[in-house]
């Protein structure tokens, strides 16, 4: 599978994203031909690329030259424009997801329904070209997964159609909900609404780069030239070929010895519903010879704070420990398979090269055991036997 990692050390914008994707191998003429499938007048815009330097780093700059006076388009106008185009279904779906996230953010900022959202800067032809262009490029390159580094917040103020606003702009701040960010960069707008919307809508994960065999690297330049670092977004494209996938997760732990054990089960349910990768209780003999439980939670980076806070509000714990751990995992996916008992969900486990096993889902087996009046173990055996060759 082909994947791409967005290294946003200096930030991200829509035009920077398209520029970096072009460096990864998208022909500019192909991009022009595909963008022409949008129901926009040919005189409304033109695109071009140039090679630039940012703090000694060679990068591509993507330009969209549009008519000076742009109408303030509503979200529904842009959604209809994309749907009416002759672009591929995958490109349409990606572009629609990005604009929907933008509309959600604008609706929250201005306190209106999504259908009433009208875009200013992001409704211009240049932003439409940036977002649809990014979708076209991702489709051309055959990207199956998109992973993104934590994003820099930036600081200061930015001039917008609504006046002078703090960085990140309100819509950008809304788009960053649930995304890991940091403040380890200088002043200025580092993440634009279009850049934030692209990764918020399309990213499969945020954090460290996944294991891959690197195929190409592309650098997309922004319009500004910062004093502290090269203003580029770096995209690393590769093939996900590792037999054992490697990533980093976090372990959250705490010891509990003064809580009604009936509540522990409820706490586990809440943690799993909140996005914990796994939850376990282990018996302990604690100080003063009291029996207790060790709570262990496996968490992704973006769920770390939320899960820790949930432990502190739903239990008697007054503190938690957490630390990163590396892990190696097999690829897994939920699929539906046909059996004599009906269509069932199973977990398909592979090493990217071959299928290793198919594991029936417990909830599916329990449901079928009740519906068919069969022993649970018999349901397991039937599903395992009938899906083995599929």
UniProtKB/Swiss-Prot annotation:
GO molecular function per UniProt: lyase activity; nickel cation binding
Pfam families named in the record: Ni_insertion
Keyword Hydrolase tagged: no
Keyword Glycoprotein listed: no
Keyword terms of this UniProt record: Nickel
Gene3D superfamilies, sorted: mk0293 like domain (3.10.20.300), Transcriptional regulatory protein pf0864 domain like (3.30.70.1380)
HAMAP family recorded: LarC
Name of this chain's protein: Putative nickel insertion protein
Taxonomic source organism: Geotalea uraniireducens (strain Rf4)
């Amino acid at each position: 599978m082909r994947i791409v990692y967005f290294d946003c050390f200096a930030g991200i914008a829509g035009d920077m994203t398209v520029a970096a994707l072009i460096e990864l191998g998208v022909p500019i003429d192909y991009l022009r031909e595909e963008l022409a499938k949008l129901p926009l007048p040919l005189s409304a815009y033109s695109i071009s690329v140039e090679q630039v330097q940012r703090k000694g780093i060679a990068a591509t700059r993507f330009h969209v030259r549009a008519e000076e006076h742009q109408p303030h388009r509503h979200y529904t106008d842009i959604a209809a424009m994309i749907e009416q185009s002759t672009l591929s279904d995958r490109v349409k779906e990606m572009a629609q997801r990005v604009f929907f996230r933008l509309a959600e953010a604008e609706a929250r900022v201005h306190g209106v329904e999504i259908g009433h959202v009208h875009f200013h800067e992001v409704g211009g032809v240049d932003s439409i070209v940036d977002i649809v262009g990014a979708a076209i490029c991702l489709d051309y390159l055959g990207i199956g997964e998109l992973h993104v580094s934590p994003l820099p917040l930036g600081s200061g103020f930015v001039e917008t159609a609504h006046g002078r606003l703090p960085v990140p702009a309100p819509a950008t701040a809304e788009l960053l909900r649930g995304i890991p960010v940091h403040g380890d960069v200088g002043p200025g707008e580092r993440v634009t609404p279009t850049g934030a919307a692209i990764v918020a809508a399309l990213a499969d994960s945020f954090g460290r780069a996944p294991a891959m065999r690197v195929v190409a690297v592309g650098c997309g330049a922004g319009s500004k030239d910062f004093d502290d670092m090269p203003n580029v977004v770096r995209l690393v494209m590769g093939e996900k070929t590792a037999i054992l996938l490697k990533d980093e997760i976090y372990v959250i732990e705490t010891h509990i010895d003064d809580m009604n054990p009936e509540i522990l089960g409820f706490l586990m349910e809440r943690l799993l519903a909140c996005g914990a990768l796994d939850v376990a209780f282990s018996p302990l003999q604690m100080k003063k010879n009291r029996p207790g439980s060790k709570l262990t939670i496996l968490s992704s980076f973006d769920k770390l704070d939320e899960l820790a806070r949930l432990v502190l509000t739903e239990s008697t714990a007054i503190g938690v420990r957490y630390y990163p751990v590396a892990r190696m995992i097999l690829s897994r996916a939920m699929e539906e398979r046909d059996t004599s008992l009906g269509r069932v969900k199973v977990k398909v486990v592979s090493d990217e090269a071959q299928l290793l096993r198919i594991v029936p889902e417990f909830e599916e087996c329990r449901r079928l055991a009740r519906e068919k009046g069969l022993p649970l173990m018999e349901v397991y055996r039937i599903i395992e036997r009938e899906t083995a060759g599929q």
